[in-house]
Amino acid sequence: MPNLLEKTRKITSILQRSVDSLETELPYNTMASRLADIIDCNACIINGGGTLLGYAMKYKTNTDRVEEFFEAKQFPDTYVKAASRVYDTEANLSVENELTIFPVESKDTYPGGLTTIAPIYGGGMRLGSLIIWRNDDEFSDDDLILVEISSTVVGIQLLNLQTENLEDTIRKQTAVNMAINTLSYSEMKAVAAILGELDGNEGRLTASVIADRIGITRSVIVNALRKLESAGIIESRSLGMKGTYLKVINEGIFAKLKEF
């Protein structure tokens, strides 16, 4: 059987794999699955709001009611609030504890069920919780060491992703501000009219029709589109006689136009 060092290496190797986005469906399934295999348990990871980021079920313990929480990828508020008050790892909680992940209606089915909850921190902030559980058999000290390491690994990844997301948001806002500052009043008017024509973030438009409707020349619209495209705000493609296909790739422009 693998020793503690080998198990630790398997978990820390996940740091070498990037999680590209928290928007991805269940971005931490790999971590949960790896931990479940190594410790021989069920495992799940939730963020501070109770959103499920990943899980692995080696053993069936859920009722249909609880299974709905996993399918919805959202834990109930009462459980999330209780878990948020766990500041250090709470190990081997019985089915009678309020923090047990075993359904209340399954207490008689799994009388020896045990739950362990480890808080996930990053940069001094509480980012979520790592939860593991078994039908029986206590989690050993070695198991708990692996849980602590896993929560640290997830905390590092979550913090890095949040930092990257913040930097990306700042870059996009800066690009929008710079683009807006290059537009004349007429060009701003044209941009507002153009984006108002789109169906969501993309669509087809005819510059001459918009120009006639808002009382500007077609060249004003063309210049405005060129400035936005060069700033990386939009993508455009000529459709010939059918007009121009437009797609917004920096949605920050919509919020900025509300100030216009």
Curated annotation (Swiss-Prot):
Q: Show the disulfide pairing.
A: none
What GO CC terms are in its UniProt record? cytoplasm
CDD domains in the record, alphabetically?
Answer: HTH_ARSR
Q: Which GO terms describe its biological process?
A: negative regulation of DNA-templated transcription
Entry's Pfam families?
CodY, HTH_CodY
| Keywords of the record | Cytoplasm, DNA-binding, Repressor, Transcription, Transcription regulation
Matching NCBIfam families: codY_Gpos, PRK04158.1
| Name this polypeptide is given | Global transcriptional regulator CodY
Query: Organism, per UniProt?
Result: Streptococcus pyogenes serotype M4 (strain MGAS10750)
